[in-house]
Amino acid sequence: MSAKRAVKDKATSAAGLVPMIVAYFGKPGSYSHEVAARRFPRNAVLKSCRMISDVFEAVTRDAADYGVVPIENTLGGPIYDTVDELIRQNEPPIGLTVCEELSLHIMLSLLGRKTTPPKRIYSHFVPLKHCGDWVRARYPGAAILEAESTSEAVERAASEPDAWAIGNRGAAAMHQLHIIVPKLGTRAENITRFYLLGRHAGVPRSATHTLLVFGLQHRPGSLVVALQVLQKHKINMTRIVSRALPHNPEEYLFLVECEGAMNQPHFQKAFAELTVKSRHLRSLGSFRVVEKFE
């Protein structure tokens, strides 16, 4: 956040004149929208972004105070568009930081018009992967079609008279659709985790986790050596994702989330040691993990 805007916010927020701007991935009614609305229930303007990269850009350019992006789904795995944008933050100039981790228990619903049997049922590939068999068995005459997101699927169902969608039940009222089946899913728990992005320096006192990004020399055992540093300092790793460098596919960058904060002495020692045993090491923020939204 720019100094000018920060001063303006501080001077006028008490009077409610300048609302906070929160960018989120997807359209109104998406799960990112729901998380943003529940995290900032008052005095915030929620800004829809078509692409995950647009959320990063909005916060980077000070067009938004915060951004909400998905990082991982328990059924679908990592959200690689978010991973790639985070890894790009390893390149100077210093970009964003992760301020919080949020999570949402995903409740998939079948949405449509009760008066019209479906000829097409839309959804994102992850819900279709886990609910598709049930939908095909229940509605054998409907074509099951993939959309870019559940919010886009709901929009298609709203614009096509004989189409339904699998998506967020919160989007039904926005698009004048009925909730045909309130809860779809499998026995597996369906949770999506999100990062709250900002440009705040420093480490919050409530921080419990840190996100690191680094590269390694292209030689056997280099990743093991790096992870042994965390083990040595009793730092628990909670997430690791690797991505090949676009200009050199034989080399990888690693995004590592671990327990601990940059203001803790044992973590500082581990960071200093890891600096020697890795390449381009950077902290993308120490943050707290917020209670899951049900």
Regions found by a protein language model. Name each.
Residues 1-294:
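Domain-level signature for soluble enzymes in the chorismate/prephenate branch of the shikimate pathway
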